[in-house]
Amino acid sequence: MSLVEAIVYLIASGGHGMRVDQIADQINALKLHQRKDGQPVTLQQVYAVIMRHPETFVKEDGRIRLIM
């Protein structure tokens, strides 16, 4: 699954917002997204994806939430 799909899945499954570091940790722990080089997903990558999709995500009180 793509990184944006993995982020949406985690936030929707949890039912509440998550911090960026929590999202990155869960993506890696659950192996929801694999980088082409085999390295773990970084919190910088997660943050960059979130910032590229303002129509999907909002940052409130240090947590990332879905706009839906």
Residue ranges, per PLM feature:
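Short helix-capping/hinge SLiMs at alpha-helix to coil transitions
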Residues: 12-16
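Charged low-complexity interaction tracts in eukaryotic proteins
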Residues: 1-4, 18-21, 26-68
